[in-house]
Amino acid sequence: MNMDFTDQRLSYEKGQLDQQSVPISPFELLKAWMHEAIEEQVQEPYAMSLATCGADDKPSVRIVLLREITDKGIVFYTNYESAKGQDIAENPNAEALFFWHKLERQIRISGSIAKIDADKSAAYFQKRPHDSQVGTWVSQPQSGEVASRDVMEQTFEQLQTDYPDGAAVPTPGFWGGYEITVSEIEFWQGRANRMHDRIVYHKEVDGSFSTKRLLP
């Protein structure tokens, strides 16, 4: 039986976005909105949908966690040998999307993607909880087939024996950070009657950003 949602409606009335009052830098607005999401206790405000597309022209999307906002983009960490890592190796273009229902906001980020410095990746890996470090070694190759959950648990237990709590877990060479260097970023604020506010920043040749309002 089909599920019909055509009668479902929600009026967005929690905010507004004015082109004349936004900062020159999109990163200032990104940080401000992220701060508000944290203050409003949005669950997992750092969670973003990451869309990639490999040489096969088949798009893939999944949730990853934002770990840093830099002066040129955003950083997340993952397994370089994962499906997303293979996509990125074949096509260094990606998009990320934050959606915060509680604030009736979304942020769409487009840009080129590349690995960050290996030392920086290692430094972050060593900051992670011990068991998360161990779990990274279990997921190799990430998205690879496994016979059962028991096999995963046994591998995890063996690695915990090899690297007991307090022992240094080596940083995997197959794991690290990526940075999306922003070329375009859109801020969306829900409004009543589908008259949503959409302000997009576009990176110019000289590195500055221009803004424009888009129709909802």
UniProtKB/Swiss-Prot annotation:
PANTHER family: PYRIDOXINE-5'-PHOSPHATE OXIDASE, PYRIDOXINE-5-PHOSPHATE OXIDASE
Cofactor list: FMN
SUPFAM superfamilies per record: FMN-binding split barrel
Keyword presence, RNA-binding: no
Official protein name in the record: Pyridoxine/pyridoxamine 5'-phosphate oxidase
Pathway: Cofactor metabolism; pyridoxal 5'-phosphate salvage; pyridoxal 5'-phosphate from pyridoxamine 5'-phosphate: step 1/1; Cofactor metabolism; pyridoxal 5'-phosphate salvage; pyridoxal 5'-phosphate from pyridoxine 5'-phosphate: step 1/1
Gene Ontology biological process terms, A to Z: pyridoxine biosynthetic process
Disulfide links within the chain: none
Binding site for FMN: R62, I63, V64, L65, L66, R67, Y77, T78, K84, Q106, Q142, S143, W188, R198
Top EC class for this record: oxidoreductase
Catalytic activity: pyridoxamine 5'-phosphate + O2 + H2O = pyridoxal 5'-phosphate + H2O2 + NH4(+); pyridoxine 5'-phosphate + O2 = pyridoxal 5'-phosphate + H2O2
Documented EC number(s): 1.4.3.5
Subunit structure: Homodimer.
Function summary: Catalyzes the oxidation of either pyridoxine 5'-phosphate (PNP) or pyridoxamine 5'-phosphate (PMP) into pyridoxal 5'-phosphate (PLP).
PROSITE patterns: PYRIDOX_OXIDASE
Cofactor binding, note field: Binds 1 FMN per subunit.
MF terms (GO), sorted A to Z: FMN binding; pyridoxamine phosphate oxidase activity
Binding positions for substrate per the UniProt entry: R9, L10, S11, Y12, R67, Y124, R128, S132, R194, M195, H196
Family: Belongs to the pyridoxamine 5'-phosphate oxidase family.
